[in-house]
UniProtKB/Swiss-Prot annotation:
Taxonomic path: Bacteria, Bacillati, Bacillota, Bacilli, Bacillales
Full protein name: UPF0735 ACT domain-containing protein SSP1116
Gene3D superfamilies: 3.30.70.260
InterPro entries: ACT-like_dom_sf, ACT_dom, UPF0735_ACT_dom-cont
Residues of the ACT domain: 74-149
HAMAP family per the UniProt record, alphabetical: UPF0735
Gene source species: Staphylococcus saprophyticus subsp. saprophyticus (strain ATCC 15305 / DSM 20229 / NCIMB 8711 / NCTC 7292 / S-41)
Protein family membership: Belongs to the UPF0735 family.
PROSITE patterns for the chain: ACT (PS51671)
Length: 151
């Protein structure tokens, strides 16, 4: 994958989002608050097809003012399994003045591994996109994805 082949994030007001995206956000909130509820039941409550829910559920995240004070997020990196790879990633994060909350490196399979990092960016003014781009340009990192943000 090309280092420039990544998704950029935007902050968008809810009133300009398509109805299906807004419904997806509401369904995610309902499912979060009531784990016993099935996806089928939740989408039925909001009159949304399951296919529309699945299309948007991993691409839309609620954000509010709390992100300014918290600045915690989790990334997953897809990397080649080479000696020193994790050290290179950690060095990059140190140079960006980020605090590492948790690290998990998967067992390498077929020369590939994933590194999941929970980070705290309160000590830097960098945006998440800047952090992701800095990690994308590290040799042997093929993909970087944002998987969660603490709000």
């Amino acid at each position: 994958m090309d280092k420039k082949d990544y998704k950029k994030f935007y902050l968008i007001r809810e009133d300009v989002l398509p109805e299906s995206v807004v419904k997806t956000l509401k369904i995610k909130e309902v499912l979060k608050n009531d784990p016993s509820l099935s996806i089928f039941e939740a989408v039925k409550q909001f009159d949304l097809s399951r296919s529309a829910f699945y299309k948007y559920r991993d691409t839309i995240f609620p954000i509010d003012e709390k992100i300014e004070s918290t600045r915690e997020f989790t990334l997953i990196l897809y990397v080649n399994d080479i000696v020193g790879m994790l050290a290179e990633v950690l060095n990059t994060l140190s140079n960006l003045d980020l605090s590492i909350l948790t690290i998990h490196q998967s067992i390498p399979m077929e020369g590939r591994a994933t590194i999941t990092l929970s980070l705290d960016a309160t000590s830097t003014d960098l945006e998440i996109d800047d952090v992701m781009e800095a990690l994308r340009i590290v040799d042997h990192v093929s993909k970087v994805e944002l998987i969660s943000m603490t709000i």
